[in-house]
A protein has these predicted regions:
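Metal-dependent nuclease catalytic cores in nucleic-acid-processing enzymes
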Residues: 101-107, 172
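A short, highly charged nucleic-acid-interacting micro-segment common to nuclease
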Residues: 85-101
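Nuclease-adjacent, charged terminal/linker segments that flank catalytic cores
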Residues: 1-87
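Well-ordered, non-membrane alpha-helical segments in soluble/globular domains
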Residues: 98-101, 163-167
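Active-site metal-binding core of divalent-cation-utilizing nuclease and nuclease-like domains
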Residues: 57, 92-93, 105-149, 154-164
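Non-catalytic C-terminal interaction segments of nucleic acid-processing enzymes
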Residues: 2-5, 11-17, 25, 156, ...
Length: 243
């Protein structure tokens, strides 16, 4: 392994990979290299991989690289009092994890608005006791702090299974006040299908929907979110929904 001198940005990259498990090159570029060329981003990340702070995985030659925490990254964080685990191999459902981290990036690129973002795999370590585990819990300053629970649907679950999970949110979660449940899908067609089922079930809990690609492109503060309980709803911002 080569020896490198770490910058503050390097440390933030390593820390974020530890929390997020696996981040794509593009996700890291959006978070930490907004005005840097793709080649320069890859060079910076390769340097951290070669030094052992990160590990890299690529499903095939044409796939985007995934970056996780390496052994020297683990030692770096533990020296700062942060418990961390080296990432060995992406999970079988890596597409779902990448999608959740796309949500993370869409939230965290606006640091003045975000209060917190916790993915499902972080919640147990924070004392989450409910059997129902959302894909993410997001806190936003709108300007008052508001909490949103997030479900990311790739269309791989059956509709009865997903609707059954949504039904679990209807009565709320003890000790976890939340403004709304955000349903994020990969396609507009899937979102419309879910909206029809939400209306059919007659849910009272506010459920706001959007498409992941639009959220990634425009950010969490954009007017993207539709109230799925309504027929032909207008798109609004989360700030407007919190008023």
């Amino acid at each position: 392994m080569v020896s490198v001198r770490l910058s503050e940005r390097d440390i933030r990259v390593v820390s974020k990979c530890a929390v997020s498990k696996w981040l794509t090159t593009g996700q890291l570029a959006r978070l930490y290299f907004p005005k840097v060329t793709p080649d320069a981003v890859r060079k910076s990340l390769r340097r951290l991989v070669e030094a052992g702070f990160l590990v890299v995985h690529r499903e095939h030659q044409m796939a985007e690289a995934l970056h996780g925490l390496g052994p020297k990254g683990k030692a770096l964080l533990e020296a700062k009092g942060v418990t961390a685990e080296v990432t060995r191999k992406p999970p079988r459902q890596i597409e779902h994890m990448v999608g959740i981290n796309d949500l993370r990036v869409a939230v965290e690129v606006n640091p003045t608005q975000v209060a917190y973002f916790f993915a499902s795999w972080e919640l147990q370590g924070l004392g989450w006791v409910h059997p129902l585990i959302p894909d993410a819990v997001v806190g936003l300053r709108l300007p008052e702090r508001r909490t949103f629970l997030v479900e990311y649907d790739r269309g791989t679950e059956t509709l009865p299974t997903l609707v059954g999970k949504l039904r679990g949110y209807e009565g709320g979660l003890s000790g976890i006040p939340f403004r709304a449940l955000l349903l994020v899908t990969d396609t507009a067609a899937r979102l419309e299908t879910l909206a029809r089922h939400v209306r059919k079930e007659g849910f009272l809990r506010r459920m706001l929907g959007c498409v992941l690609a639009e959220l990634s492109a425009e950010g969490i503060d954009a007017a993207l979110f539709m109230d799925l309980r309504r027929i032909n709803p207008d798109k609004s911002t989360l700030r407007e929904s919190a008023e």
